[in-house]
Amino acid sequence: MTLQIGVIGCGAIGQDHIRRLTRTLSGARVVAVTDIDPTQAHAAVANHGLNAEVYANGGDLIEAPDVQAVLVTSWGPTHEEFVLKAIAQGKPVFCEKPLAVTADGCMRIVAAEQAHGSRLVQVGFMRPYDAGYRALKQVIDSGTIGAPLMLHCAHRNPSVGDRYMTDMAITDTLIHELDVLRWLTGDDYVSAQVVYPRKTRHASSHLADPQIVLLETAQGVRIDVEIFVNCQYGYDIQCEVVGENGIATLPDPQAVSLKHAARHAIAILTDWKDRFIAAYDIELQAFIDGVQGGALTGPSAWDGYAAAVAADACVRAQKSGAIERIEMAARPAFYRG
């Protein structure tokens, strides 16, 4: 069976997903697209040689009889509306982060999905599908290094545009760590604090960069995450887990070690899409396979809610300078196991 997918949002990430659905992945095809800018939607059809209907809006696309599943890659504040409409239609939906722009919005999606009675939502957190992170989790879960005590992490980008604001270090950048570190440790966060080192001269006047986020989990694991979005030298993701009996470190992407002209060097990636390109492929293939098999297993609406609650606390901590509590609702049995 070929899963017929409708794509809402034909910007950069939307077209990237259309490309992989069309050229890389198996078991699905794009039959419908829409974008707030109709020219973008028509360009996606032309650029990727799609035999797809262009719809005026996301609501009409979701209701289309030939659309069996929905991919939401539109502007963040529209995500909640489209995910809720897909659930109301009983259609599986893959939603890029954020699931909703507020924790309350995420909880409305959680409630709607539970009322439906089975999982329909997968959130676009791709790092749990990255080979390096999966290997790191395997080491942690095996008990080789003992119980995790501390995590030292970094999320570095070469540069960001002038529209990137201080709170986006949390909502656009740290959000990936908030999801994957919770997945790695199997533990929820209970507090967050943000501290500001000396500001880099490469940051815009309105942006505090770098930042350090300090997290604590329910089991007492301490996590520090450096966010440095104007580091200049490349796109660099680091994660070191300190356990009772040893240390496990996220491997860097494979690269050729070059000795030339009296230098020994290894190239560093500069584009986040290249760093996680395989993970993007695997997560979307997992969604296709899950829909066809009748059971989604990827990041859930509850995971989206958990990330949103933690992000809200981190943004409060940015402003207050204090340690902010992270308080989540009780996890429903629907999302356990």
From Swiss-Prot:
EC number: 1.1.1.18
Family annotation (Pfam families): GFO_IDH_MocA (PF01408), GFO_IDH_MocA_C (PF02894)
Top-level division of the source organism's lineage: Bacteria
Single GO molecular function: nucleotide binding
Catalyzed reactions: myo-inositol + NAD(+) = scyllo-inosose + NADH + H(+)
Keywords, sorted A to Z: NAD, Oxidoreductase
Gene3D superfamilies in UniProt: Dihydrodipicolinate Reductase, domain 2 (3.30.360.10), NAD(P)-binding Rossmann-like Domain (3.40.50.720)
Hydrolase listed as a keyword: no
InterPro entries in alphabetical order: Gfo-Idh-MocA_inositol_DH, Gfo/Idh/MocA-like_OxRdtase_C, Gfo/Idh/MocA-like_OxRdtase_N, MI/DCI_dehydrogenase, NAD(P)-bd_dom_sf
Enzyme class: oxidoreductase
SUPFAM superfamilies assigned: Glyceraldehyde-3-phosphate dehydrogenase-like, C-terminal domain (SSF55347), NAD(P)-binding Rossmann-fold domains (SSF51735)
PANTHER family, per the entry: INOSITOL 2-DEHYDROGENASE, PTHR43593
Subunit structure: Homotetramer.
Entry's family note: Belongs to the Gfo/Idh/MocA family.
Record function comment: Involved in the oxidation of myo-inositol (MI) to 2-keto-myo-inositol (2KMI or 2-inosose).
Protein name stated in the entry: Inositol 2-dehydrogenase
Taxonomic source organism: Ralstonia nicotianae (strain ATCC BAA-1114 / GMI1000) (Ralstonia solanacearum)
Classification of source organism: Bacteria, Pseudomonadati, Pseudomonadota, Betaproteobacteria, Burkholderiales
Gene: iolG
